[in-house]
Amino acid sequence: MISGAQQYRDKFAVRALVAHNDVAVMIEQCFLVSPQYVCMICEEVARNLKYKLVLMDKNNIQVLSGMKDACVLSALDAVDMVVSTMAGIARLQPIFSAIRVGKKILLANKETLVLSGQLFMTEVYKYNASVLPLDSEYNAIFQNLSVIYQKKLGQVSLSQYGICCIVLTDSGGVLYKITRTKLFKITPVQVYIHPNWSMGLKISVNSATVMNRVLEYIEAHHLFNVSSNEIEILLHTQTIIYATIRYSDGSVLAHFSTPDMKIFIAYAMAYLNKIKLNNISTYSKQYEIYNTYCGNNTLNLDILDTKNYPCLQTAIDASNHSQDSVIVLNADNEVTVEAFLCEMIAFIKIPNFIYRIMNTLNHFQEPSTIDDIIYIDHCIKETEIRYAIGN
């Protein structure tokens, strides 16, 4: 996103940047795009940032702090587009502030819709905001939809537009060929090394357990207004086909791409236009595309076995049950993954912990506000799950 704003300064200007506590990255981005405002959620960190920016002759940038200021920035009149990339439950408040003044939301994380579900989409309709997914699989689906459907995202059913099913693909993660015996000894470093994507530690673990795709399954339910029998997840280790749409007349549309997030970011930034970000491969002839993607091999798609990926069925059951179950699942997974990264539990035990906690701690009421969502998330993360893992 930052590189796109740099490359197309005549089209995009960054008004504000918001982060939690990473001063070094914020300073770097301030030099790259010169925002008018920056906000650090932690007040002490904001003071440190302001001091360093003044020393670097960047005292023209106004430094703010706290969640309240983050919400103000996301609703600024001068802002047309808000990119949601913040991690954690805190991301919800600034995004809802942007929605309530009708902003265009570029959704880069899965958890926003996973946590807030129908509440999020209801607010989007109510305030005439719009949503553009940045996540590769959903961006791929979105690109294959008609503009009419895109404009009514989440409000209409697939069948109204002749679509019978959307198909997500999953690489199977870096461990998909590893035997069960060896999984007991898998370390966080081994999970981190993915053959096709460069990802953070948590996302790498979620990829290996297929929880990434699980969250996307839940996200699809709200974003595209689809039922469980209108979504399929297939194993596709080559990571070439990101998603397909199956139409009622028997035709199938697929999105092919190299594993480069810049392609999906460029599409969302310049929606209904096309721009090319630097360092993205292009192909002058059709056969070059075919040879690059297929070569002498076939494109492999297979059923994703829930026996090998038990998190998948647990999540499907949670999404079919209730929104509070989904919030419990997300918090449950975050703490369990953290336990693995800290080497408190074995990798193979992750699905067991998630399943056990889902079946013992799922006793909350259906959330109707952001505060309800935050309360459930807090209860699971700070008390019950930590106790369960510790014992």
From Swiss-Prot:
Signal sequence, renumbered to the chain: none
List of residues binding Mn(2+): D135, E137, E216
Keyword NADP belongs to the record: yes
EC numbers, comma separated: 1.1.1.267
SUPFAM superfamilies according to UniProt: 1-deoxy-D-xylulose-5-phosphate reductoisomerase, C-terminal domain (SSF69055), Glyceraldehyde-3-phosphate dehydrogenase-like, C-terminal domain (SSF55347), NAD(P)-binding Rossmann-fold domains (SSF51735)
UniProtKB keywords: Isoprene biosynthesis, Manganese, Metal-binding, NADP, Oxidoreductase
Catalytic activity line of the entry: 2-C-methyl-D-erythritol 4-phosphate + NADP(+) = 1-deoxy-D-xylulose 5-phosphate + NADPH + H(+)
Disulfide bonds: none
A molecular function GO annotation: NADPH binding
This protein's record includes keyword NADP: yes
Subunit structure: Homodimer.
Protein name: 1-deoxy-D-xylulose 5-phosphate reductoisomerase
Binding annotation for 1-deoxy-D-xylulose 5-phosphate: K110, S136, E137, S171, H194, S207, N212, R213, E216
Pathway: Isoprenoid biosynthesis; isopentenyl diphosphate biosynthesis via DXP pathway; isopentenyl diphosphate from 1-deoxy-D-xylulose 5-phosphate: step 1/6
Coiled-coil features, chain-numbered ranges: none
Pfam families, alphabetized: DXP_redisom_C, DXP_reductoisom, DXPR_C
Residues annotated as binding NADPH: N109, E111, G200
GO biological process terms held by the UniProt record: isopentenyl diphosphate biosynthetic process, methylerythritol 4-phosphate pathway involved in terpenoid biosynthetic process
Role this protein plays: Catalyzes the NADPH-dependent rearrangement and reduction of 1-deoxy-D-xylulose-5-phosphate (DXP) to 2-C-methyl-D-erythritol 4-phosphate (MEP).
Cofactor: Mg(2+); Mn(2+)
Xref: PANTHER family: 1-DEOXY-D-XYLULOSE 5-PHOSPHATE REDUCTOISOMERASE (PTHR30525), 1-DEOXY-D-XYLULOSE 5-PHOSPHATE REDUCTOISOMERASE, CHLOROPLASTIC (PTHR30525:SF0)
Family: Belongs to the DXR family.
